């Protein structure tokens, strides 16, 4: 056990984390050169295309150190994006140390800080590494100062490396062996293991990535899952090198996979504890918390016939993604679909893209919303995740919205524009710190202002230099109202929004104008109205397509023409009362992009 090292890598998106992992695998001979592909551990197509890691992965390598001893290195690859921070915290809790990888040209970014603090809070040993040292723009001295000033980790002896060329890889492995402590644990104690991640395999059922804390798990051992008390027989255990390799057992301190014919992913929740069925541990490991979605959106199949297929696709995705929560939703405008909860906007995009790509579905997505609290006059608190769930006739004492604390890191030339953006989004400045050329801004912002287009605008006004990380703070009383959109006097439930009263008139007008351009002309007039309660705040018409019914009247009496026009008018009126307006997908997306 003293020769085991469990470690994780903390890095911002695109700072070279997955490439360093590839070099480790190559250096320790995990795969032959022929089998090596770029970013071995990013197994989903979408991960490779976007160049990001979404699911946690793991690999076990044997490393012959300079002191001639062989060490078992268990490396757990983690996602870098703010939406997947729960996956990061679970992966970190299975390790004794973490490599902090920072791009030597870009310096420290907000996401790195957040994950690094998580690691330090859990008592991990952090080993700094400067990657991309061979870039012409690399400035290692500045970055070392930044790591020490911003994060507070000793970095003067950081390893200089270039994952692309393979420089410094052996030095990093030596640092892991020297600095990261060996795991603690007792092989004779009752079994205790942490589920780091779970995914579904069509043939094997649920495969769980686990870190054994105490005891030893062998095949045919009977185990128990702590949170639901269910018992299972272990079919197979083993390690990833990075291909799956069967072993006889997993001992205390080791990381590997476990298959126990568990039928669905809820049977092995991520972050939960596994123990022996007969000789059980008395209490579970700390830190398990069910994942709470923060952003909700309605997703509907464009064709009603796809509903069953959509439901099955969601159930399959849910097998691999414990953070995904959904419930059926019925909309007058869009028919049957699901209200789905996500960790954040990137998570939402990825889920929608996977549904469309892997399951061949055409979907319409409504504007994302967050969870609000409503206090009624009787003192009862409701939580709602959709504007259509707001009780219209009940008296609301106060409306509360979720507030987040955002930590924004940016170069000093863009501070002005970012402060303006935060003020526009109803932000309250809490702190501002200048560190060399970097500035750290801390703002409290309403989450629903961030959900729409905050990230996109932050990136565009700072030319991509700003990075941001946020955490949920509290619910706070706010003057919010429900804005409804009516098409031909019929409210469209999926277009309703919850917004601040001060923005309502401006946003209502803007939305109506945008929809006027996007709704195609019909055979009858289409009226678009924005209203708050019974008060109409904006209105616009999409003119009808008309046939020239008087074309064949040459000269003659005016009453003949009028008779034809009146007949057309009556027909249009009747058509309008029975006609349905087809709303294209762009209209729902327009709700997302109102400034």
UniProtKB/Swiss-Prot annotation:
GO terms classed as biological process: positive regulation of translation
Disulfide bonds: none
Domain tr-type G, residue spans: 2-184
Cellular localization per UniProt: Cell inner membrane
Keywords: Cell inner membrane, Cell membrane, GTP-binding, Hydrolase, Membrane, Nucleotide-binding, Protein biosynthesis
GO molecular function: GTP binding; GTPase activity; guanosine tetraphosphate binding; ribosome binding; translation elongation factor activity
Listed EC numbers: 3.6.5.n1
InterPro entries xrefs: EF-4, EFG_III/V, EFG_V-like, EFTu-like_2, G_TR_CS, LepA_C_sf, LepA_CTD, LepA_IV
Enzyme superclass (EC): hydrolase
Entry GO terms, CC: plasma membrane
Claim: Hydrolase is one of the keywords in the record: yes
Function summary: Required for accurate and efficient protein synthesis under certain stress conditions. May act as a fidelity factor of the translation reaction, by catalyzing a one-codon backward translocation of tRNAs on improperly translocated ribosomes. Back-translocation proceeds from a post-translocation (POST) complex to a pre-translocation (PRE) complex, thus giving elongation factor G a second chance to translocate the tRNAs correctly. Binds to ribosomes in a GTP-dependent manner.
Protein known as: Elongation factor 4
Originating organism: Ruthia magnifica subsp. Calyptogena magnifica
């Amino acid at each position: 056990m003293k020769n085991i090292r469990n470690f994780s890598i903390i890095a911002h998106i695109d700072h070279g984390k997955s490439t360093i992992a590839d070099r480790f695998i190559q250096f320790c001979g995990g795969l032959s050169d022929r089998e090596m592909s770029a970013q071995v551990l990013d197994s989903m197509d979408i991960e490779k295309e976007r160049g990001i890691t979404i699911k946690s992965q793991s690999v076990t390598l044997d490393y012959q150190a300079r002191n001639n001893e062989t060490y078992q290195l268990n490396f757990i690859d983690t996602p870098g994006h703010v939406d997947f921070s729960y996956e990061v915290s679970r992966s970190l809790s299975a390790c004794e140390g973490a490599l902090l990888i920072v791009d030597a040209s870009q310096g420290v970014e907000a996401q790195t800080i957040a994950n690094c603090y998580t690691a330090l809070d859990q008592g991990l040993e952090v080993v700094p590494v400067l990657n991309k040292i061979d870039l012409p723009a690399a400035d290692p001295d500045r970055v070392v100062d930044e790591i020490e000033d911003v994060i507070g980790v000793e970095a003067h002896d950081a390893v200089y490396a270039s994952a692309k060329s393979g420089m410094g890889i052996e030095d990093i492995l030596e640092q892991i062996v020297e600095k990261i402590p060996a795991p603690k644990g007792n092989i004779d104690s009752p079994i205790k293991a942490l589920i780091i991640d779970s995914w579904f395999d069509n043939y094997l059922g649920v495969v769980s990535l686990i870190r054994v804390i105490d005891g030893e798990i062998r095949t045919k051992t009977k185990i128990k899952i702590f949170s639901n008390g269910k018992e299972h027989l272990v079919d197979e255990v083993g390690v990833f090198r990075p291909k799956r390799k069967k072993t006889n057992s997993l001992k205390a301190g080791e990381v590997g996979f476990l298959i126990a014919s568990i039928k669905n992913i809820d049977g092995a929740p991520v972050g939960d504890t596994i123990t022996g069925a007969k000789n059980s541990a008395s209490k579970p490991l700390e830190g398990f918390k069910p994942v709470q979605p923060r952003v909700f959106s309605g997703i509907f199949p464009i064709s009603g016939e796809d509903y069953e297929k959509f439901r099955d696709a969601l159930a399959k995705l849910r097998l691999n993604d414990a953070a995904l929560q959904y419930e059926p939703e019925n909309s007058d405008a869009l028919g049957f679909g699901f209200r789905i909860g996500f960790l954040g906007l990137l998570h939402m995009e990825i889920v929608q893209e996977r549904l469309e790509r892997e399951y061949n579905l055409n979907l319409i997505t409504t504007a994302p919303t967050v969870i609000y609290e409503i206090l009624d006059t009787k003192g009862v608190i409701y939580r709602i995740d959709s504007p259509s769930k707001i009780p219209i006739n009940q008296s609301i004492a106060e409306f509360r919205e979720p507030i987040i604390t955002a930590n924004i890191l940016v170069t000093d030339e863009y501070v002005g524009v970012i402060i303006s953006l935060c003020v526009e989004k109803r932000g309250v400045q809490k702190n501002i710190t200048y560190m060399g050329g970097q500035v750290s801004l801390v703002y409290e912002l309403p989450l629903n202002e961030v959900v729409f287009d905050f990230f996109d605008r932050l990136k565009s006004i700072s030319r991509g230099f700003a990075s941001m990380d946020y955490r949920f703070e509290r619910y706070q009383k706010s003057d919010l109202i429900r804005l409804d959109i009516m098409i031909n006097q019929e409210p469209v439930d999926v277009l309703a929004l919850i917004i601040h009263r001060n923005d309502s008139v401006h946003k209502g007008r803007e939305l109506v104008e945008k929809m006027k351009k996007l709704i195609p002309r019909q055979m009858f007039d289409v009226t678009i109205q924005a209203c708050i309660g019974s008060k109409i705040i904006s209105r616009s018409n999409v003119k009808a397509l008309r046939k020239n019914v008087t074309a064949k009247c040459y000269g003659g009496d005016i009453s003949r023409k009028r008779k034809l026009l009146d007949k057309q008018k009556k027909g249009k009126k009747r058509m309008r009362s029975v006609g349905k307006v087809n709303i294209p997908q762009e209209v729902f997306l327009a709700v997302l992009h109102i400034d």
